[in-house]
Amino acid sequence: LRVQWKILCDFDGTVSLQDVTDTLLERLGQPGWRALEDDWVAGRIGARECMSGQVALLDGDVDALHRVLDEVRIDPAFVRFVDLARDLGMPLSIVSDGLDYPIARILARHGLHQLPIIANRLLRTDAGQWRMASPHAQPDCASGTCKCAVMAQQEPARSTLLIGDGRSDFCVAGKADLVFAKDGLLRHCRASGIAHRAIDGFDDAISLLHELVAPAVASARFPLPVPQRA
């Protein structure tokens, strides 16, 4: 019986070649955002508290935001990966602890308007200030987007392939059926014994996805257990 997969894909540092929120803060952030970052890195505050405080320190209007976002590059193989996932019947969602509007604008530039985006919301007040809302937060999770809750809610009958690179993916990686991992997430998977394959980018992910759906090939070249459902 062929395993049915869904794909949850991180954005910052995974699809994009840089962290979009950090890029916005470096260009438009008022003093104080780095101190919040230091508090988060040190574990004194959670990711949601950090991001909410940092977004409130963004300066500049929508045009200024667009100028920064329109310089952000994505992995050149990502569009081909999206096409392959669609052809294979694998629903793909962007699940990010970043900001929805920047992600949507960047993806739209590459013709990817159709991808579902589950992320924190970037809002602008009547007074022209930026703020963040977290509709996908959970009371027992410090992240703005609880990726574990998202995974549980999205087509639970399908096995989950997670693609990511960093700390916001650590918790959900332990619950996913398989992880395509890079950078910090790769180190975490290795240290925690989580089923994974290492990638440098989406060229690698394309090759691995082909292997994943070809059982005869996978048995010889993809030495990972096929998820078993009761």
Regions found by a protein language model. Give the residues of each.
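Alpha-helical substrate-recognition element adjacent to the catalytic core
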Residues: 2-121, 126
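C-terminal cap/substrate-recognition subdomain and adjoining C-terminal extension
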Residues: 77-91, 98-230
